[in-house]
Amino acid sequence: MYSILVNALGMISFTLVTTAALHANAQPSSQGGSRPPLIIAPTVEGMLLCDEAVAQKNVRSMEDAYSYCRQRKLDGSGRVARLLDRLEPGGPKGTVQVGYTATLQLLALYRATPKGWEIDPARVDEFLGVIRKVQRPVVIYFSADHFDSIGPITEELRKDPRNLMQLRDGKPLELGYFGYRIMPYTLSTDPALAVNKYRQDALNYVAKRIKTLPQAVQSRIVAYTLAGELHHLFPDFENGMGAYQDIQVTDYSPASVAAFRKWLSAKYQTIEQFNTRTGLVYASFDEVPAPSKNIRKEKLAAFGEHYDAFADGTLPIAGWLWDPNKTIQQLDLFVNGKLIGEVPRGLNRLDVYRAEASITSPNTGFRFDLDYSAMPAGKHRAQVVATSNGSRHQLAEVDFVVVPRDQGRVASARAAEVPSLKNAKALPGVRSWLDMPKQLQDVYYNPLARDWNLYRESQVHAFLGEFHQWALKAGLPAQKLYSHQIVPNVNSSWNPQLFAAGQTLQGSAPWKQGLNMYGGATNSPWLRDFMARNKITEYGVPEFNPQQWKLQGTHLAAMRSHYDAGAHFISPYYFSIVHDRFKGAAEHGVNRMELRPDNPKDGSDSFYKAIIEYAKN
């Protein structure tokens, strides 16, 4: 989610190396066998900023600096090369090699002409010029998601509502991310839409230009990451990823709702089967709504309209657990005294890590998404039970209420529970908290809401699939095509329904997986298990930052874990070659992560040093 900083200030890039050089140095991994070198390909802010502009004291802004460089056909290749040589002196070699990630915003390539919007060849020239000159491996990131929003064509695209996702009121989201405007571009794959035509044409043009590069340069391109973080959008994009109350989601545009009805028709075949399986009553699929109303606050024409964070039949039982002595061997969820299953733990809770000095790992989260869809109406009790040396202790308990569709009264009798549990607070060193659900949370299962969420996931998958097809048809090599995706579920306090990205994260996808990782996700047993369950083998990490500072060796351990797991590349976020006089003074969640030896925030200085150390391998 942090790729916007470099997008706002200029394209980014990483060093290049020939395929022969990469594979000549293949070495055994610690798990046995051999593998090609791991490419450490940091995001570099300011890739197009030339030394000559920096030397001109009268050049005061980044915009003026870039103009100065473009007018003289200069670029930042020298500055990029010097940065990477500091990280790995003497060029790329060994089992770990330093490169860089070059970001190209596709819609930003367009300029207005008397004939309409056309690609500016000079913008592509300057981008590829750096790639030609910097002799190190490079990951090229084709940015075409909601962060591709700074080009002059953006204003024209936003005037046509067909290009944008909409909230239920028919309006597109007005979003920002640390001062950077976000555009809620549609996930529709309709090639007639202007936004899709311009994105595909730009990708075709750049791919054609790449194929004219000398073979030695092309071979230094180790991966292409596609489109950026593709997912649905929601209000308060900076802070709202964990919203569960009064949620709003996309896409309720007329085209999206019409496609939802077609999706339902394909799934159920007939309206009679739909009515039978859902218990809802509609005369035709054309009458079926995209659910959008909260039954607690709004009048429904029919129950199928109900939508909230729990309407799809899942209730998260989630919180955090700090157990530094590894006293607890297992967490289990019991509902009404019956075992439901083991509670996944070790999920990312960077907020807890930041809030409490004595907690030295962000991987404290636990979460079980309880499917309550088949449970009877009434009050139920959930208990999170910890097993320690054969004894069971209650870590948390909470009551929730399943409400019938008619909102009729339910029995208030005390639900059954696991008796005679010890208190987990008595376990030495153990600290915990239950965040969700709130006590007596009321839930209303609407099967149409479950379908709506699945359909929204299919929209994200379909667009990424279409973008992947564009790349293949443009002639880019299939073995180098990676996604650039977020994994919301690794953060136990987030609401994955807001993103609806789950279907894109399967190992069966035609693209290779590129999974962004921040905080505890960078070295996460939960995420490794997730990848194993989803049969993800070949992968890369297009954005990577542990954001930790409390324990020595954290950053090295995280990078080594991905070497051992077979990652092709990881892209530390982020380095900057922008002169300080061009940077804003305000600190925010993104620029805290600038990797430099004098920036202790979020452990950025330690990560900087760890990259230098690891590149010696």
Language-model segments: what does each one mean?
Residues N348-L370:
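Aromatic sugar-binding surface patches on proteins
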Residues G32-T43, Q56-Y110, A122-Y141, W470-A474, ...:
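Catalytic domains of carbohydrate-active enzymes, especially glycoside hydrolases
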Residues A8-A20:
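Bacterial N-terminal signal peptides
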Residues M62-G76, T103-D120, G179-A202, Y445-H461, ...:
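The substrate-binding groove and active-site-proximal loops of carbohydrate-active enzymes
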